[in-house]
Amino acid sequence: MYKRKPWQILHSVVTVGAVAGALGVSAGAQAAGDPIKIAVIGEESAIAGASITRAAQIAADEINAKGGVDGRPIQLVIYDDHSSASEGVRAFQRAASEDKAVAVIGSYISEVALAMEPWSARLKMPFITPGAASNDISKHVHDDYDHYKYTFHGWMTSAFIAQSICDFSHDILVDQFHMKSTAIMSEDAAWTKPLDEKFLECLPKAGLKVVDHIRFNPDTTDFTPIFNEIESKHPDVITTGISHVGVQPTVQWQAQQVPLPLTGQSSQATTSTFWKDTNGATEGVITASAAAPGVAITPKTIPFINAYEKRYGDAPAYTGYSTYDIVYIIADAIRRNNGSTDPDKMVDALEKTDYVGTMGRWEFYGRNDQFTHALKYGPGFITGINLQWQDGKQVAVWPKALANAKVKFPSFVKVPQATN
């Protein structure tokens, strides 16, 4: 298979006019017709990473079909960082210095996004991550706002992901299935450290005693010993934090007939290809996600899913929803700035974001909030959903207002009888 150079451009939107001036050089609006260049850094070999670049292309095409931003087309400059922090940084640097992007959308991997963040500060480049979850991304902005203010967190922080899973666990696992205990099983990665810290705090409050806490190497290939250890502690459910891995633990969970529900965050399970990837072993798996096919979180959700499926043949991963919204949010910020792409004015406009996208209502936390420039979490904003794989399809099982199915488990999973 042909291997591209780490920072190689994969494709871009056809645009007209000359390339706009370098970011930070011109504080005013560019000439009408000049393209607005947005860099998109993804991971093409990963399910979530490929969804970033694909969704961005759909959003840009839609915006351009409607006349662009006050007559100026969006031009995407797309890179593949191959899930490497160093390659991600090189792509980020090239986006600013050579390709003259006005903003960067980049990476679902926390280690990669955290490596890019200092360059966002140094280059004064507006940067929004559509999938990385580490609390440290927004914590850096909070702790040194003037330096890091160019970074925005376009996905839920690890703390909010954990809280969403705890809210689901309380409403469904505890209240309906009367479960009382759980084992945490997370990959050892930057995003899961704060995730697990929050799990240890909020799962007991949700009604689930934590009887085991396992952090495993993402390179693990045999999960049998891990599942054996968990079973020996007799929890009612497994709460996961997995993204870099997904297929192998799911396949072994089914093959080993582990009699415990698999819930939590399984990022790879958020895409519709996961059924095929696991040969159906994902039946019954529950994961937090941004949305699910057929679930109208807002009037924009299903039209986007349909457009994505029509173009690419499968549904987007969670990063697809966020990236699609982010392209629109950047375009909206430039429009509200009367066309200016000055980085400080971009920051001001992004801070004033109030946008209803595919995932819900977007606003960012302020300078004095704990998670500065992170997505606001909670009712009326973005909470995510929990979906379950049932009969080869993803269905929404939480929250109640969006659910289109009730939780059911494979026959090998032993759970108490649910009550409505």
Segments (PLM) and residue ranges:
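Extracytoplasmic ligand/sensor domains, especially the bilobed periplasmic-binding protein
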Residues: 101-212, 261-284
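Extracytoplasmic "Venus flytrap"
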Residues: 37-57, 79-86, 108-109, 185-194, ...
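Hydrophobic alpha-helical
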Residues: 110-122, 199, 228, 233-256, ...
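Immediate post-signal peptide segment of exported/extracytoplasmic ligand-binding proteins
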Residues: 28-40, 68-73, 172-180
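Beta-alpha junction/loop-to-helix N-cap segments that form part of ligand/metal-binding clefts
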Residues: 33-35, 48-57, 66-142, 154, ...
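Segments of small-molecule ligand-sensing domains
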Residues: 310-320, 331-398, 420
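Extracellular/periplasmic periplasmic-binding protein-like sensory domains
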Residues: 134, 158, 250-324, 336-337, ...
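Short, low-complexity disordered leader/linker segments with a strong preference
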Residues: 1-37, 65, 416-420
